[in-house]
A protein has these predicted regions:
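HIT superfamily nucleotide-processing domains
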Residues: 1-107
Length: 107
């Protein structure tokens, strides 16, 4: 895997994804290899290394609005959701992303 799967694969169109939400600045899609029955990834469409390095407050608000909207839909459809982001050594792909999850972990 590259350092930035989201820029190199998803945003470039090299890896086709099932979109859940899209705006000019944010994309949400079903994870290509889900770890939960519902596993949606929400990303900014420009490269941002992590939550700790984002300096564009407008983009951060747009991203969190998308996370909130996707999570609300998951709660409506499945009764519950988790929202997760990883930092430091826990962050495999060095592109800010949030996971919106529901159900019991499947792998």
């Amino acid at each position: 895997m590259t350092e930035d799967f989201y820029c190199d694969e998803v945003l470039s169109g090299r890896t086709v994804v099932e979109k859940v939400f899209e705006s000019d600045t944010v994309l949400a899609y079903h994870h290509t290899r889900p770890f939960w029955p519902v596993h949606i990834v929400v990303i900014p469409k420009v490269h941002v290394g992590s939550l700790l390095t984002i300096d564009d407050n407008k983009l951060l608000i747009e991203l969190l609005d998308a996370v909130k909207s996707v999570a609300a839909k998951v709660v409506d459809e499945h009764g519950a959701a988790r929202v997760l982001t990883n930092l430091g050594r826990y962050q495999d792909s060095k592109h800010l992303h949030f996971h919106v999850l529901s159900g019991e972990q499947i792998r």
